[in-house]
Amino acid sequence: MKIQFKFLVNIFLFLFLLNSCDNQEDSNNDETIGLEIHQEDQLEGKKELNGFQIAYKVVEKSNYYTVKVAINDVRLVASIDYDTEFIEIDGKNVVLSSKEKETLLMIGEEISAYLFKDGSVDDFTMAEFTLLKLLEYWAKSPSNYSYEKIVFKGNQTNLVKGNDDGITCIRKNTYVTAVYDDNEGQIYRDRELVNGDRCLGRCGSGCPGVFSIASAWTKDCLDHDQCGRVLGGSTNPFDRNCGDEYAQAADDFLFGVLRGCRG
């Protein structure tokens, strides 16, 4: 009887210690991204990174998502309704430095590594998806880009310059004509191979993606990529000529994957 009791006590202690270790590991992982709240309808945290104080928050209510990201005193805000494909993105015309953009990518990479630490990239909440997509979108703006207010309502937008194709899926390894313009309004048309030169047409930079999450392949993203290749730098294809193409790709970043634009 004593032996049986001692055996049960040892089993209990083993399970208690095992659970404590798991909880400690989860707590340590939370701290790496400054996570404070992690629920299906909310993701929130803050931490110091790369010399900046970063705060992020995404909240869902009736499939309407509000995202707020702060880097020191700079605030970036977005509202997304996935039912109606409504987007409003506003940065109050702030211009981020290259280091600030680098920091947004860094926090996104850390959050992505935390969320997909088990290797699966298909199991995510829409709150997680929305935050990662916006972090990448904001971080990959053209040089000296002013984060003006952008509004998409279905196929309509407040943008007045450029050629917005809505969310038009394109297929990898096919030829599609990219249409874009420069800062003077001159229009260019180039027939290009989708998935050619550094993954032309992918909503995001390079291959594989910056974060471990599915990406869309769309016409607006092709237009922006080709604009950058021709009018931007050879290694960092983002400049003032391609700001309108960048803005027009906002809905592609967020809704392209959900529309099935996976190439």
Locate each region found by the language model.
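Bacterial signal peptide processing site
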Residues: D22-Q24
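Extended terminal accessory/targeting regions
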Residues: D26-G263
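Bacterial N-terminal signal peptides that target proteins for export
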Residues: M1-V9
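C-terminal motif of bacterial Sec signal peptides marking the signal peptidase cleavage site
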Residues: L17-S20
